[in-house]
């Protein structure tokens, strides 16, 4: 198995978000890897109303810190994980995630969740996990939804 040094966890607010955070944290601890949690606020629904993206990103960090408080506390207290950070950006989700969060961090591994889109929606918008698998040069681990 590869020795991962930098792990990126893509958070989307879906039901798999905690599972993604826990899996990424476990892998980071096992490998002594730096860990970055990232989230993208979808700008498409907000483009027409002139949203304040800086405020949306700040709110996103607060929301993630709140929703994953227990997981983040455990990760930050784990001496096997050298660094932990949470970053939020606004934009088109898949592209912004890849270009503004993942590529600058240069991870060895990206951990993301399965969104569970309907067949119709998948045809029209695709999925973020599929985009990441096809476009990133590093390993991508997709955490499946539990039935």
Identify the residue ranges that each predicted region occupies.
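Short, well-ordered secondary-structure micro-motifs
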Residues: 20, 47-50, 96-99, 122-123
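Aromatic/hydrophobic pocket-lining residues that form π-stacking "cages" and hydrophobic walls in ligand
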Residues: 24, 72, 97
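Small/aliphatic-rich secondary-structure junction motif
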Residues: 2-54
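General small-molecule cofactor/ligand-binding pocket signal
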Residues: 36-38, 85-89, 141
């Amino acid at each position: 198995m590869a020795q991962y040094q930098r792990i990126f966890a893509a958070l989307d607010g879906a039901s798999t978000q905690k599972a993604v955070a826990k899996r990424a944290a476990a892998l980071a601890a096992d490998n002594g890897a730096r860990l970055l949690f990232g989230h993208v606020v979808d700008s498409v629904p907000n483009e027409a109303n002139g949203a304040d993206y800086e405020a949306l990103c700040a709110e996103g960090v607060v929301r993630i810190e709140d929703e994953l408080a227990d997981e983040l506390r455990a990760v930050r207290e784990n001496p096997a994980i050298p660094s932990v950070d949470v970053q939020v950006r606004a934009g088109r989700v898949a592209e912004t995630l890849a270009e503004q969060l993942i590529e600058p961090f240069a991870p060895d591994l990206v951990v993301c969740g399965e969104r569970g889109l309907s067949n119709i929606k998948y045809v029209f918008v695709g999925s973020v996990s599929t985009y990441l698998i096809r476009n990133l040069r590093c390993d991508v681990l997709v955490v499946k939804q539990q039935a």
